[in-house]
Amino acid sequence: MLAIVGLTGLGLKLSFLLTMISGGQIFFAIFLVMMISLILGTGLPAGPTYIITAIMCAPAMLQIGMPLLIVHMILIWYSIDSDVSPPIAVCAMAAAGIAKADPMKTMFTAWKYSKGLFILPFLFYYRPLLLNGPWLDVIITIISCTMGLIVSAAFLERYLHTKANLYELALLGLSSLLLLWPPLFLNVLGLLFLGIVSYSQKRRIAKERRSGPVEKPQLAVP
């Protein structure tokens, strides 16, 4: 595979296309790298996927102004994602075989639960998540990003303290985005929305306890 990339000039062509299609916009460049890594990862393990994406994508990412450390952390992170991404999802398929579970259901459940993998590489660039900034910014980033990922999991499962209604689900989705995005005032706004949902659900739980049994969460078993 590496010989094909080198002899055909595919690496240089893809690097040029990545720069051209993204228009030099870093957000779109990271998104395109995610898609390339996802496609390569359907048939290759993490190591070869990283090597090939580094050959094909790293020059273009450096050319549009991304730091070297962040470029390779993004490529490594998305390469790891190949193990749980359909349609191959090697790790999920192995787990399904061990558990004697439905392979397709296990694969898509693993993909759903690993959604944080898709978000974190963007944070590597837009936030000091790699500990390359002032210590106060790093602490705020770690706390807000951790909260954002927890809230995004609650959004995907439609469950915080109890099952979320449509209004609460919308607030959870908005809260997770605001907690992950850089400006501090947006993080505070995200916490406010999370507090509203938490208060609303706790009130509903208290009301249900007075009138009947509380709804229990359903575990997603592949």
Task: Annotate each PLM feature.
Residues M1-P222:
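Alpha-helical transmembrane segments of multi-pass membrane transport proteins
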